[in-house]
């Protein structure tokens, strides 16, 4: 799996589920004949194969529960020594399967709807997921990071949800983590921006299954700033690395036994 993949698509099919509309976008070179009629014919053709999905074995992990707990203890020791304030350790799980994994994505869309849903088929591998988080967004001359830290389940009751959100706002651990991530975002944007400010702070946002605390940090790009470099300098997300970010990533590379691959990356 590549670490970075940039694709310039000739055709884009845009679904607007709110308006129940479908828009076709085509990138044409000067003098090139349009291929939209063939694309429209393919869309209208309902003669397509359907494949089932089934798991073919148990869920496994490259490391045992005890090994993962030992890794967490190493992370805690580094925090206690003052090497980092926060470190986010992860563990890989593997599920063998047969059939069409797009069915899993469709199920994910139904049971965990989020602002960002994605499915990419690169031939030899697929990446799909569901996320509420905007890592970095650049519009005109402004860059935005939306740190998310602080999560609790939803109850299904409006009054109870409000109480859960208030408890989340009062939780010292969740607040400490959130403040740290806001500071990281301010620092990351300051490398290429000026007038860096917090637009809103620790705002409870309600999703299908959980309540998150979300802030928004913005900055105006410096006159000589490059937008791509601005994004690169914010990567990876502090929510999946730690603080100070560089030292946390160094320790993660030492502690975790495998590369994270697409996990913790960005889709856009």
Where are these regions (language model features)?
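Extended alpha-helical targeting/anchoring segments
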Residues: 1-268
């Amino acid at each position: 799996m590549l670490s970075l993949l940039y694709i310039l698509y000739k055709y884009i099919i845009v679904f607007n589920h709110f308006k129940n509309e479908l828009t076709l976008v085509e990138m044409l070179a000067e003098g090139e004949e349009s291929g939209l009629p063939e694309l429209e014919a393919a869309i209208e053709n309902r003669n397509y194969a359907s494949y089932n999905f089934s798991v073919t074995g148990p869920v496994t992990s490259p490391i045992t529960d005890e090994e993962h707990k030992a890794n967490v203890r190493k992370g805690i020791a580094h925090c206690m020594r003052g090497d980092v304030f926060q470190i986010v350790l992860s563990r890989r799980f593997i599920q063998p399967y047969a059939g069409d994994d797009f069915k899993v994505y469709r199920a994910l869309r139904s049971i965990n709807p989020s602002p960002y849903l994605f499915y990419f088929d690169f031939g030899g591998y697929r990446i799909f997921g569901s996320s509420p988080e905007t890592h970095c967004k650049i519009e005109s001359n402004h860059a935005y990071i939306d740190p998310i830290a602080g999560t609790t389940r939803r109850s299904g009751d409006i009054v109870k949800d409000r109480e859960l959100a208030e408890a989340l706002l009062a939780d010292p651990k969740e607040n400490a983590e959130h403040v740290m991530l806001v500071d990281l975002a301010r620092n990351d944007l300051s490398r290429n921006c000026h007038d860096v400010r917090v637009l809103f702070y620790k705002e409870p946002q309600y999703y299908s299954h959980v309540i998150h605390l979300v802030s928004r940090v913005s900055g105006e790009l410096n006159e000589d700033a490059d937008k791509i470099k601005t994004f690169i300098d914010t990567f990876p997300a502090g929510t999946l690395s730690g603080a100070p970010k560089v030292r946390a990533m160094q320790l993660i590379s030492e502690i975790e036994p495998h590369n994270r691959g697409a996990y913790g990356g960005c889709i856009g």
